[in-house]
Structures are given as C-alpha cells and as structure tokens.
From Swiss-Prot:
The protein, known as: Formate-dependent phosphoribosylglycinamide formyltransferase
UniProt keyword annotations, A-Z: ATP-binding, Ligase, Magnesium, Metal-binding, Nucleotide-binding, Purine biosynthesis
Subunit text: Homodimer.
Any single Gene Ontology cellular-component annotation: cytosol
GO MF term (any one): ATP binding
Domain ATP-grasp: 119-308
Catalysed reaction, written as an equation: N(1)-(5-phospho-beta-D-ribosyl)glycinamide + formate + ATP = N(2)-formyl-N(1)-(5-phospho-beta-D-ribosyl)glycinamide + ADP + phosphate + H(+)
Pathway annotation from the record: Purine metabolism; IMP biosynthesis via de novo pathway; N(2)-formyl-N(1)-(5-phospho-D-ribosyl)glycinamide from N(1)-(5-phospho-D-ribosyl)glycinamide (formate route): step 1/1
Residues the entry annotates as binding Mg(2+): 267, 279
Protein family according to the UniProt entry: Belongs to the PurK/PurT family.
A Pfam match: PurT_C
Gene3D superfamilies named among the record's database cross-references: 3.40.50.20, ATP-grasp fold, A domain, ATP-grasp fold, B domain
UniProt-annotated binding residues for N(1)-(5-phospho-beta-D-ribosyl)glycinamide: 22-23, 82, 286, 355, 362-363
Length: 392
C-alpha cells in the first residue's frame, strides 16, 4: 500500500529528477500536486524543472561519483531519470543496494544507448526491427553501410533529439556523416548504429503504462519529425485494428522485459497492418505532450501514479488533439514571448518551458489544441505556435 509523506517534513516522500527539462518540469508539477518533496538535477542552472522543485542541484550526471554523492546526500525515495546521459552503472549499483530507480536501473541502462535496447528487442524478444549494424571506427562504419546498403541512417548509439543523425543517400556523404555522428553523441565520440531505411506509412508513439493494476495503453500518438526532432504530434493516430493490436503486443513485451512501473514511450513504424519496433524511452516522451490537453490523465500524471505504486484504472481520451512546438532561432539569455493572445483560446492552450537561454535553435514551448478532427487540431496548434513572437 502506498503511503505518501508531506514535503519538507521528516516523513516526506522524496523524488529526485535526473534531468530537469520540459518533461521533467511536468513530472515535478505532478509530484507537487501530491505533496511530494521534489529535487531537480541537471547539468545547467535554472532548468525548467528546477523552477518548480523544492531544491535543485547542478552536476555532471555522467560522473558516477558525483551522482552517487548527491543521491546519498538527498536520500530520495524515488530516482526518476528524464534523460539518457546518466551514469547508469552507478544507478544499477545503487538499486542493488536498495535504492528505487524508475522504472528500473536496468531499463535506464539498456535505453541509455541504442545498442542495448536494439539487441533486447531484435535478438532477445525477436521483435521486427529495421536491419542494423554497429561500428566503432570510420572503417567499420563504411563496412556497415556497405552491408546495409543505401539509403541508410547513421546515429550515435547515445544521443537524443536528432543530434549526430544523418540520412545517407550516396557514398560521398559518408565522411561528413561519420564526423557529425562523432560530434553529436551525448557522451562524446564513439560507437554508432547504421540502420536500413524502413518503408512505412507513418510513425507512432504508443504511450504504455506498466502499473500495479496491469499494462495500460494511451491512444496512439502520431507525429511529424524534422531534423530528428518532433514538430507536431496528434492523438489519436488512425490505424487498422490489426495494426493497433500488433503495436500493443510489441509494446507490452518491451515494457515487461524492461521491468518496473512507470510510463514508457514506445516508438513504432506502421505500414498497413505491419508494425516495426523503433525505440523506447522508459519515461514520458516529447511527442506525448499532446496528452496535456487530450486526456484526463497526462503522460506525466500517469508516470507518477504508476511509479508510486498507485493503480491507473481507465485512461480517458477526449478526442482529436494536437501539439506543435515553438522552435525559434536566436541567441539570448533574456528571452521574451509576445503575441500570446493568438496562442490561447477555446480549446487552445500554451506551455512555455522557462528555459533560461537559447543559442541557435531550441524548443522553448508548445501549443496544444483540440478540434473536431485531427487535421483541424494540427492546423490550429501550428497556427498558434507560428503566431508567438520570440525575442531576446
């Protein structure tokens, strides 16, 4: 039975967020709703979740001893990773000593890099995936491309938001693709995955919750990617009953194999009735921000409810909804937002993340819309996002 203490009191229930971006901010808010003491950690100060947490710490989370020292200092009841770039071996050791890691330290370790989760999915669980090879050197990379064939995709085994990722159409792109992959890894230069191109009709994120009362599925989320990062997402994505059944079967296998309780973002390719596994995040997914307006329980509320050991019950989806990102390009440490009257209204909401600075292109907010159709919801969200004026 779950018992929650009161924040800032001796019996407080403490949650430590490792990673304090916009997704962590929403998780922190859901924890605050339940009176949970929230500690936000990231590699830079004033990150979004730090602005709504009880305490904040700035450390290099890839440095195992620094991470261990902070955890031993704060003594959280739950450690909740929000990003991949964490010293996961340290989390495994701490979990073995009794520390609770959400959903499990093994899940964090396997999904920290694309190799761990790809080998689990393709080789252990025998799920359908794209063809793939791994490489440690430029010579090995070129050999992998020859094996896979063109066109293909190369990604650092550890990166996010499209960093270091290239779509290779011809052999004269290989040197630049290798160089970019070595620059884009979250933990520095190193191993890459070369993937064959999958012919698909659309991509989905199947938000899957593993909780004390079983495995639950949100309605499938469709999304559009550009430069490796999402631009719009919508719910529900229309798909055949057979494809949805297959998608749920794949997602169930993956989350049960990873173990623990929480919400998982399972990314899948859909072609007709066929479904191919792509990736999984053992935490809320950026494309799932649409659930802030589309469901009675957002992906963040579901994640917190699940890892606290509370039942999820039924998830109510309200109908066609969409999100669109606010993605300006500028350099500033004093960003302001204008023309906001065009970004809010009936069935139209706005979230600004509070990121302290921007240097280039950065996702600073999202608009959320509901409508009578998915197409109309996407159009409303995109129009609202485009109307916001970002200055600094």
């Amino acid at each position: 039975m779950t018992v929650l203490g009161t924040a800032l009191r001796p019996a407080a229930t403490k949650v430590m967020l490792l990673g304090s971006g916009e997704l962590g901010k929403e998780v922190a808010i859901e924890c605050q709703r339940l009176g949970i003491e929230t500690i936000a950690v990231d590699r830079y100060p004033d990150a979004p979740a730090m602005q709504v947490a009880h305490r904040a710490h700035v450390i290099n989370m890839l440095h195992g001893e620094s991470l261990r020292a902070l955890i031993e200092q704060e003594k959280p009841d739950y450690i909740v990773p929000e990003i991949e770039a964490i010293a996961t071996d340290t989390l495994v050791e701490l979990e073995q000593a009794g520390q609770k890691v959400v959903p499990t330290a093994r899940a964090a370790k396997l999904t920290m890099n694309r190799e761990g989760i790809r080998r689990l999915a393709a080789e252990e669980l025998q799920l359908p995936t794209s063809s793939y090879r791994f490489a440690d050197s430029e010579e090995g990379f070129r050999a992998a491309v020859t094996d896979i064939g063109l066109p293909c995709i190369v990604k650092p085994v550890m990166s996010s938001s499209g960093k270091g990722q290239s779509f290779i159409r011809s052999a004269d792109q290989l040197s630049e693709a290798w160089r970019y992959a070595q620059q884009g890894g979250r933990a520095g230069a190193g191993r890459v995955i070369v993937e064959g191109v999958v012919n698909f009709d659309f991509e989905i994120t199947l938000l899957t919750v593993s909780a004390v009362d079983g495995v639950h599925f949100c309605a499938p989320v469709g999304h559009r990617q550009e430069d490796g990062d999402y631009r719009e997402s919508w719910q529900p994505q229309q798909m055949s009953d057979l494809a949805l059944e297959r998608a749920q079967a794949i997602a169930r296998k993956v989350v049960l194999a990873l173990g623990g309780h929480g919400l998982f973002g399972v990314e899948l390719f859909v072609c007709g009735d066929e479904v191919i596994f792509s990736e999984v995040s053992p935490r809320p997914h950026d494309t799932g921000m649409v659930t802030l307006i589309s469901q009675d329980l957002s992906e963040f509320a579901l994640h917190v409810r699940a890892f606290l050991g509370l039942p999820v019950g039924a998830i109510r989806q309200y109908g066609p909804a969409a999100s669109a990102v606010i993605l300006p390009q500028l350099t500033s440490q004093n960003v302001s937002f204008g023309q906001l009257q065009s970004a809010v209204g009936a069935g139209l909401q706005l979230r600004l993340f509070g990121k302290p600075e921007i240097d280039g292109t950065r996702r600073l907010g999202v608009t959320l819309a509901v409508a009578d159709s998915v197409e109309e919801a996407v159009a409303r969200a995109k129009t609202a996002a485009a109307a916001v004026i970002v200055e600094g």
